[in-house]
């Protein structure tokens, strides 16, 4: 099957925003105007096309990345836009990061009322890290308190990359009629009766001409600063054509020197078509970007793949989902080469050959079967046994693309199936969830036998429990959310472990002496082999390390994992006949426990970065409450009538905070929180936690 459009007419874009900035609504309008849907889906009616999980329809938030292909004609040429819709809620930021890897460009949506919000700043930093070009859309211009110029200034001050306005609004709040195009110097008014499908291009009203002229000058100055030739023309007072400006702005956007800024109101159907034009005009096609780099797993050499159908096949699995009818769906972005339905691919990450069954072009939750997928394209594959982050390629030309690092879960909860018959089904479902979501884990407590699920926040786990019930019919009882505490040490200590077992026949002998010392917070674990003169044979050194690591899974204070420790193995002894791998594992484990007792062990807890937005009059109450939760206020910022309070608060104190905040602010306060770092638990609180944990273990 030939391509629908040539690769240079392809745009792979993400739509990224803070929760409630109107991202899904904007996506819905794009699908409507590109002819993909015949009725506009409203989020608050629970009918949005891209939000297709029942939990999303109920909560009005986007949880999974849905991807869809649509087409747009610009200057008589047909383009394909693959849209990856991403969630704005902090518990799901893993979805955003995972999709960044496969995007060529991003539309960042900001609310004209709330401006640049914390989650948008975090996502912008991720876009910087993945070097993704972007354009900005200031949405909700029809809302009370909308202010394009204030938000533009916030983008300029808070985010990297210089913004350049290519439109300004025609009116604001309930007077918002349309936009002024600063390139063409025309006003665009949308016709309400056509649901915004039709608009008229008219002369700029006299009262806006001066402002438009001022902002056009700013736009030209900003663009020519990125292009020496145009700068020369500009300084000589020569006329610069619209074509030249667009070309220079495209180049500067792709090189991440500028971010074009547009505005509108997706809900009121205003501003979406020019946004689509800007996606075509300024965001890159796969061939406008540098080739992808990876490593050859056989040789360790660097490999490069250019976005061409003639190169060896290479694709990245960026999302895995289970579908009740098709089984596992693996979403892939093809970076080079082509893949035919039914052919074999090499999963370089797992080092195995796999068969790609059917290939599906996805439109939110409906699908179209295709026979071949080519370089630059995105599709879902049925029948692959891949996990998120796997590289799929041609076996003769193996390559592994950089694997993403995901944060460890910070919260856990005990669950048990309500009926015995669901026990086995539950473990299959949990395995599926772990494949789909790298920040979700399921484990069994070795002492109590309880099943524990671990995730990035309360909402994350709630939704997983909800999915068990809705998608698989498994009802579970849930325990109270638990904090993922850890343990560490404060000082150096030496520990000795000796394991001698003499029973009839061959005995066991292992003997290790180690020194442990604290590492900086977040540094993890280091093991140093400092054995001289063969007092422990080389083959048993890894056994000691394995034993140490095993002991670190169960700290001596309360059985929590031990982190941020350097272990130096420097002495010990062995027996010619009785020494074995298992004996040295036990010796390593005993040595660590011995040393840890003397090393001033302490309990660590996850500290969350909390940002609360509240009307000014409730600030005192909100701060008082955060202080009572052992919070440290890190700073405050005024945004008109709203105050943003930034604080570091222990996760243990944040359960049920949403309800408290609602009552403190009469429902007007909002907050987001994300993991920041681990810190020591104050002694009297640590004693209480250790006491409760030990009581729980003995009961």
Curated annotation (Swiss-Prot):
SUPFAM superfamilies: EF-G C-terminal domain-like, P-loop containing nucleoside triphosphate hydrolases, Ribosomal protein S5 domain 2-like, Translation proteins
One protein family per Pfam: EF-G_D2
Residue span, tr-type G domain: 8-287
One annotated GO biological process: ribosome disassembly
Cysteine pairings via disulfide bonds: none
Gene Ontology terms: cellular component: cytoplasm
Molecular functions per Gene Ontology: GTP binding; GTPase activity; translation elongation factor activity
Subcellular location: Cytoplasm
Organism: Aquifex aeolicus (strain VF5)
Cited InterPro entries: EF-G-like_DII, EFG_II, EFG_III, EFG_III/V, EFG_IV, EFG_V, EFG_V-like, G_TR_CS
Functional note: Catalyzes the GTP-dependent ribosomal translocation step during translation elongation. During this step, the ribosome changes from the pre-translocational (PRE) to the post-translocational (POST) state as the newly formed A-site-bound peptidyl-tRNA and P-site-bound deacylated tRNA move to the P and E sites, respectively. Catalyzes the coordinated movement of the two tRNA molecules, the mRNA and conformational changes in the ribosome.
UniProt-listed CDD domains: EF-G, EFG_III, EFG_mtEFG1_IV, EFG_mtEFG_C, EFG_mtEFG_II
Full protein name: Elongation factor G
The family this protein is said to belong to: Belongs to the TRAFAC class translation factor GTPase superfamily. Classic translation factor GTPase family. EF-G/EF-2 subfamily.
HAMAP family given in the database record: EF_G_EF_2_B
């Amino acid at each position: 099957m030939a391509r629908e459009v040539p690769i240079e007419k392809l745009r792979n874009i993400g739509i990224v925003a803070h929760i409630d900035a109107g991202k899904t609504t904007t996506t819905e309008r794009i699908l409507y105007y590109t002819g993909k849907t015949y009725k506009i889906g409203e989020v608050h009616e629970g009918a949005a096309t891209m939000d297709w999980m029942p939990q999303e329809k109920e909560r009005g938030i986007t949880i999974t990345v849905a991807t869809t292909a649509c087409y747009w004609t610009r200057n008589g040429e047909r383009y394909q836009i693959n849209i990856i819709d991403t969630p704005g809620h902090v518990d799901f930021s893993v979805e955003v990061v995972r999709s960044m890897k496969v995007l060529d460009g991003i539309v960042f949506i900001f609310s004209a009322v709330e401006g640049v919000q914390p989650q948008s700043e975090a996502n912008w930093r991720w876009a910087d890290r993945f070097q993704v070009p972007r354009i900005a859309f200031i949405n909700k211009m029809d809302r009370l308190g909308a202010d394009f110029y204030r938000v533009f200034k916030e983008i300029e001050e808070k985010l990297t990359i210089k913004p350049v306005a290519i439109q300004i609004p025609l009116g604001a709040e309930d007077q918002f009629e349309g936009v002024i195009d600063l390139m063409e110097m025309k006003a665009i008014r949308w016709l309400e009766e056509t649901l915004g499908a039709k608009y008229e291009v008219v002369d700029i009203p006299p009262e806006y001409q001066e402002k438009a002229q001022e902002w056009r000058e700013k736009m030209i100055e900003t663009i020519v600063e990125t292009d020496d030739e145009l700068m020369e023309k500009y300084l000589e007072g020569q006329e610069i054509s619209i074509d030249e400006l667009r070309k220079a702005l495209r180049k500067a956007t792709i090189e991440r020197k500028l971010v074009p800024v547009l505005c509108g109101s997706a809900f009121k159907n205003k501003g979406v078509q020019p946004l689509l034009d800007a996606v075509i005009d300024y965001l890159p096609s796969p061939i406008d970007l540098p080739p992808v780099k990876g490593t050859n797993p056989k040789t360790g050499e660097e490999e490069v793949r250019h976005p061409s159908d003639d190169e060896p096949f290479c694709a990245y699995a960026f999302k895995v989902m289970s579908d009740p009818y098709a089984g596992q769906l693996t979403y892939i972005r093809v970076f080079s080469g082509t893949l035919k339905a039914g052919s074999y691919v090499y999963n370089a990450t797992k080092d195995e050959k796999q068969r790609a069954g059917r290939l599906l072009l996805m439109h939110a939750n409906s699908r179209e079967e295709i026979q071949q997928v080519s370089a630059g394209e995105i599709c879902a594959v049925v029948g692959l046994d891949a996990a998120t982050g796997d590289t799929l390629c041609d076996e003769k030309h193996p390559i592994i693309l950089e694997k993403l690092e995901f944060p460890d879960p910070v919260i856990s909860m005990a669950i048990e199936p309500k009926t015995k018959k669901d026990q086995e089904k539950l473990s299959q479902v949990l395995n599926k969830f772990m494949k789909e979501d790298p920040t979700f884990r399921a484990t069994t407590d070795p002492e109590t036998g309880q099943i524990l699920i671990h995730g990035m926040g309360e909402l994350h786990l709630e939704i997983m429990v909800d999915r068990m019930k809705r998608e698989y019919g498994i009802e579970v009882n849930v325990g109270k959310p638990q904090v993922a505490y850890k343990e560490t040490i404060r000082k150096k200590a030496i520990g000795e472990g000796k394991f001698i077992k003499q029973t009839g026949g061959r005995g066991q002998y292992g003997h290790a002496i180690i020194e442990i010392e604290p590492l900086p917070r977040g540094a993890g674990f280091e093991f140093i082999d400092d054995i001289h003169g063969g007092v422990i044979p080389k083959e048993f050194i890894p056994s000691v390390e394995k034993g140490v690591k095993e002991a670190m899974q169960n700290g001596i204070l309360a059985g929590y994992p031990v982190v941020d420790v350097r272990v130096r193995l420097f002495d010990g002894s062995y027996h010619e006949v009785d020494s074995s791998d298992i004996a040295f594992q036990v010796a390593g484990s005993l040595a660590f426990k011995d040393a840890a007792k003397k090393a001033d062990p302490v309990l660590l807890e996850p500290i969350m970065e909390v940002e609360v937005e509240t009307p000014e009059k409730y600030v005192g109450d909100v701060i008082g409450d955060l202080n009572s939760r052992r919070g440290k206020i890190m700073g405050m910022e005024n945004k008109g009538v709203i105050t943003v309070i930034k604080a570091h608060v222990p996760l243990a104190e944040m359960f049920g905070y949403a309800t408290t905040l609602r009552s403190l602010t009469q429902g007007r306060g909002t907050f987001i929180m994300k993991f920041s770092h681990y810190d020591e638990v104050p002694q009297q609180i640590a004693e209480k936690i250790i006491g409760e944990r030990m009581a729980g273990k003995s009961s």
